[in-house]
């Protein structure tokens, strides 16, 4: 331990840290050079004042540099949310990932176990028979053979072991709730990323731009979820060519009906997996339409679809043809053979 972080804790409470100061601070955290009290002090100073784009970018760049990296196919996309919306929906981004992969777009999905719901991405995949506790080489093999791979955050970010206990003790949101979607170990350049607050979508788009993303949609559902909503309009910050455009998106613009929010509320991992299997078998309803909407957006971001309605058509075919279901079965086989 050292006292190198101490001076920056007070500074962080009174003014934004420069990119260089923030990088230094997070180097201290990730190298285990700070005491738990110092870590907590810094995280809460940032939270209370409000983190800046430079601070997000600095933390993400240090975290990316220290992760166990994965080589992904060209054009791979990540489909992920911050979590923390407290809505407990069915696993929409997880199902979306398989639908998009079934449409021929490589998906390098970064995720974790449940943080804000009864069933996070890793919980749902485990229930579906996948082994999520695999390392970078096995994930790369999955991406090459199946066109989809799941990167379990703790398997790829060992530096987080220093911070994890402090986060658990604080029991409140910190900058790390935002960093997951910004620190994909495959370094993908395209993202469909959900945020738990509409106030985060533009800053997160700015961070992804600073970190080299080519095209990304940052979204927040009007129902309060960290994905495109099927029950209301959603806010979008679309990054492309270094420019950010903000707009609202309604399900009907994609040719999809509006459904009551209650129809996509999830349950236990087993219950969510049952709904996921029904969706893969073609069961219609709010869950499928929510996945189709998010998959359509991901296909637009990946340049697989020119517009949302075309994306819905491609995503529907991925489900009804059995392609999405086949991706789940193949990934289950590959991960359990690893």
From Swiss-Prot:
Anthranilate 2 binds at residue 167. Keywords: Amino-acid biosynthesis, Aromatic amino acid biosynthesis, Glycosyltransferase, Magnesium, Metal-binding, Transferase, Tryptophan biosynthesis. Coiled coil: none annotated. 5-phospho-alpha-D-ribose 1-diphosphate binds at residues 81, 84-85, 89, 91-94, 109-117, 121. The keyword Cell membrane does not apply. Mg(2+) 1 binds at residues 93, 227. It catalyses: N-(5-phospho-beta-D-ribosyl)anthranilate + diphosphate = 5-phospho-alpha-D-ribose 1-diphosphate + anthranilate. One of its GO terms (cellular component) is cytosol. Its EC number is 2.4.2.18. The keyword Metal-binding applies. GO terms for molecular function: anthranilate phosphoribosyltransferase activity; magnesium ion binding. Homodimer. Belongs to the anthranilate phosphoribosyltransferase family. This is Anthranilate phosphoribosyltransferase. It comes from Cereibacter sphaeroides (strain ATCC 17023 / DSM 158 / JCM 6121 / CCUG 31486 / LMG 2827 / NBRC 12203 / NCIMB 8253 / ATH 2.4.1.) (Rhodobacter sphaeroides). The gene is trpD.
